[in-house]
A protein has these predicted regions:
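TPR alpha-solenoid repeat register
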Residues: 63, 165-167, 200-202, 246, ...
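Structural register within alpha-helical repeat arrays
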Residues: 60, 67, 74, 136, ...
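Structural motif corresponding to the intra-repeat A-B loop/turn of tetratricopeptide repeats
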Residues: 74, 143, 178, 257-258, ...
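Short coil turns that delineate tetratricopeptide repeat
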Residues: 55-58, 111, 161-162, 196, ...
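Bacterial Sec-dependent N-terminal signal peptides
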Residues: 1-26
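Residue at a conserved register position within TPR or TPR-like alpha-solenoid repeats
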Residues: 71, 140, 174-175, 254-255, ...
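Post-signal peptide N-terminal segment of secreted/secretory-pathway proteins
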Residues: 29-141, 145
Length: 369
């Protein structure tokens, strides 16, 4: 029994030493300025081995870190020969998201463990990457490449969701500018449900140089600039103050994209409570009901023609008349709601009057003059 325990202990020790060797190899290669093809192979081999054998939390954290960083090591190995395409491969949404996650996870682990191996480097790397990504996105926006700019702003958000909520809003707005309304709907929904929208604060201050109020980005940065004498008159504003406008935008997008009608109804009703005099919302709300009703009766002329052809056949005639009434009965609630939303609309008034007459409700038809 002791031999078995000893063997297990020995195997565990060997595995532990192997993991330490792999970590040393990865750390050494990762720190190099110039990476050879041999280094690249050694890095990949050590990374794969560490991922398979890691059992301790620290080993798992760094196994994920080194695996995720592999594309950056590949790029570094190409040196001056790296093409624009090689560099842009690091700007794929999937990698940017993983890159941001692994940086945050590694920073959190090193803070918890008190052993800061990469923290200072990663904090700088994170900031530099965000600045670079933001600069590219802004340049694309300035050259009217809205779809591409939207994609990069969204990637910036997925890279650092806690700090880049405003980038998600930029992505949504630019998707609209690019006329990609389906993507805009997705981004605006995500923005509306984000922690940034619900709890975020915008930190404003007036630039002394030009007298304009500007969004400084963070409370810490604003305090610093005010202390330097560059800004004055600080003001805070909750992000969700724009709730009415975001709901308005979502209402228009849901209508544009012919999205779920219940979702549109709930959104436009909530938006109109906040913006009761908004004409676009009024029209969107009206059309939501009117169009659903009209969709049901759009083939009524054909049905009337069929009915007129069978006046000599009472059975078929009665069946078609009954069927027509059933269709108008289904459409009635939509026309009534449309009329309630916009009682001055002549189309709604006339079609509602006709519907009442077809359904044998003459009193309601007369009242609807």
């Amino acid at each position: 029994m002791k031999k078995l325990v000893l063997s297990a202990t020995l195997l565990l020790s060997v595995a532990t030493f192997a993991q330490k060797d792999e970590l040393k190899t990865l750390k050494k290669i990762y720190a190099k300025e110039t990476i050879s093809e041999k280094d690249l192979i050694a890095y990949k081999t050590a990374s794969d081995a560490l991922e398979t054998s890691a059992t301790e939390e620290s080993d798992k954290v760094y196994a994920k870190f080194y695996k995720t960083m592999y594309p950056t090591v590949v790029l570094a190995s190409k040196g001056a020969k790296a093409t624009i395409q090689d560099q842009m491969s690091l700007y794929k949404p999937e990698f940017i998201k993983e890159y941001g996650e692994v940086i945050n996870e590694t920073l959190e682990f090193e803070k918890k463990s008190g052993n800061k191996i990469y923290s200072d480097e990663l904090i700088k790397e994170k900031g530099d990457f965000k600045k670079g990504l933001s600069a590219i996105a802004m340049n694309l926006n300035n050259t009217s490449k809205f779809k591409e700019a939207s994609a990069l702003f969204y990637s910036l958000y997925t890279f650092d969701p806690k700090e880049e909520g405003s980038s998600l809003q930029n992505a949504a707005y630019l998707a609209t500018q690019a006329k990609d309304y389906v993507l805009a709907e997705k981004y605006y929904e995500e923005f509306y449900n984000s922690d940034y929208f619900k709890n975020g604060i915008i930190y404003y201050a007036v630039n002394k140089a030009n007298g304009k109020e500007e969004n400084i980005g963070s409370k810490e940065m604003r305090t610093k600039y005010i202390g330097m004498g560059l800004y004055e008159k600080p003001r805070d504003e909750r992000v969700d103050k724009s709730k009415a406008e975001i709901l308005r935008t979502l209402s228009v997008l849901y209508a544009q994209n012919d999205s779920d009608k219940i979702k549109l109804e709930n959104t436009v009703q909530e938006a109109r409570k906040l913006l009761p005099n908004d004409e676009d919302l009024l029209i969107t709300h009206f059309n939501l009901y009117f169009n659903q009703g009209y969709e049901l009766i759009k083939d009524d002329m054909k049905m009337v023609e069929e009915i007129n052809k069978v006046t000599n056949n009472k059975k078929i005639y009665d069946e078609l008349v009954t069927k027509r009434k059933e269709i108008f009965a289904k459409a009635l609630p939509f026309f009534e709601k449309a009329f309630q939303v916009k009682p001055t609309d002549e189309s709604a008034k006339n079609i509602l009057k006709i519907t009442y007459e077809i359904l044998g409700q003459p009193e309601k038809a007369k009242a609807n003059k």
